Amino acid sequence: AVVVNPSLCIGEYDARPFSGRAVLAFATPRIPVYVRHTFNAVYTGDVAVGHIRAAERGRVGERYLLVGRNVTLQEFAALVARTAGVRPPRWRVPYGLVWAAAVATECAARLTGTEPLLPRGVVHSLRAGQLLDGAKALRELSLPQTPLEEAIRRALAWFRQHRYTA
């Protein structure tokens, strides 16, 4: 078997937004804060190509990280905000405050029967961070590297076209 592990996928066709939630959140002027966090984001189209190339060229028993760019949450939020034409978040908040907000949104979600805006698992992941190196996938699979700015632009265009955001 050949295994592929994509990082946070950003792009079109996120019909039930999961990773797209981050794009949608920072595309509105309602989110004035961010936490210190570094993660990796990759364009969904690059992930699709990576899956195909792993099936065609991948070595049996190997694992390939299908990744794009390592970025701080502050940088990501600024890219999304600039693309959406809104003000980026300005204040960094401590994890304790974010954890309390996560608990509150989970309680509210339970009462309303909806998905929590900020699950505690997400806050736990934020604190851990995620710096990834996809050199093997670049080298062996020739994984495309679409710029994160383009992935965000395409995601926002798709979300707007399908009325997820203004």
Regions found by a protein language model. Name each.
Residues G50-L117, G134, E149-A166:
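Mid/C-terminal beta-alpha module of Rossmann-like enzyme folds, strongest
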Residues P17-F18, V35-A55, E62:
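Substrate-positioning beta->alpha
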Residues V42-G45, V71, T146:
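Residue-level signal for the nucleotide or nucleotide-sugar donor/cofactor binding architecture
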Residues V2, N40, R69, W91, ...:
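Residues that recognize and position ribonucleotide moieties
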Residues I31-V35, F39-D46, Y95-E140:
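A hydrophobic C-terminal alpha-helical subdomain
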Residues A1-V3, S7-N40:
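NAD(P)-dependent short-chain dehydrogenase/reductase
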